[in-house]
Amino acid sequence: PSKAAENLKSKVASIAKSTLDLMSKTDLIEDKQKKVSSKTVTTSDGTIVHDFVDKSNIKDIKTIGTIGDSVARGSHAKTNFTEMLGKKLKAKTTNLARGGATMATVPIGTDKTENSIYRQAEQIRGDLIIVQGTDDDWLHGYWQGVPIGDSKIDLKTFYGAFCSAINVIKENNPQAKILVMTATRQCPMDGTKIRRKDTDKNKLGLTLEDYVNAQVLACSELDVPVYDAYHTDYFKPYNPAFRKSSMPDGLHPNERGHEVIMYELIKNYYQFYG
């Protein structure tokens, strides 16, 4: 054969080898992607999320304890995220959340009765503890508001009560995994009238976001994972379509909203605990 033909044959062989090498590398990359990828799920409200349960040790959770306010309790929802997660993991659940609960140990209402998430934290037990909320410190005393504070042990402040709640949970449940969830954005409605907005300031000059930001920063100091439900794109209470689908009163997620919350909590668990 001619020299040109030999060169062509050599080039073809070289290209074939390169193609096989590339295919082999592609197969390796795809295998790695399969190992780290999660199952894509479309929730009942059309939200596309990822389900990490099969890849996470969350499957080993046998008992779940939840504390928080009316959102965690499941107000205006047929079922809540704790019940959904318990069913998915086949785990027993305890939900101590109460409507109107503040983080701080401050008196509420005319009878000055305390209704705090900190007290719930003293009682809760479980392999997985979920701490949700809250907007009620922002709204306390008809918007008088609870100070955010800067002491980790001052139970009369939002920050101090939250830090103390996490610490008492750790003391009572030394092997437990902890997940935190902030308040969502809100636009409570009375028909077509907006009752309030999360951007409104209380008498301390604080918005709901101020409390959320303090809580998120505290989670870094406490080394616990947090689902920042305020800054997520999944909850849009100012959008009438979203409200009609997943948050009818502009404040409390219905069961469709709780389904999204469940998957976001699972994701945060997987990212932090594996």
Residue ranges and their predicted role:
Residues 1-67, 71-77, 87-88, 123-124, ...:
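N-terminal secretory targeting modules
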Residues 61-66, 71-160:
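Conserved SGNH/GDSL esterase-like catalytic core that processes O-acyl groups on lipids
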Residues 85-86, 169, 218-219:
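A generic structural signal for well-ordered alpha-helical segments
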Residues 132, 179-181:
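Conserved, well-ordered alpha-helix/loop/beta-strand core segments that scaffold catalytic motifs
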Residues 173-177:
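A short helix->loop->beta-strand "cap" motif at the edges of active sites that frequently abuts
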Residues 183-274:
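Catalytic His-Asp segment of secreted/periplasmic serine-dependent ester chemistry enzymes
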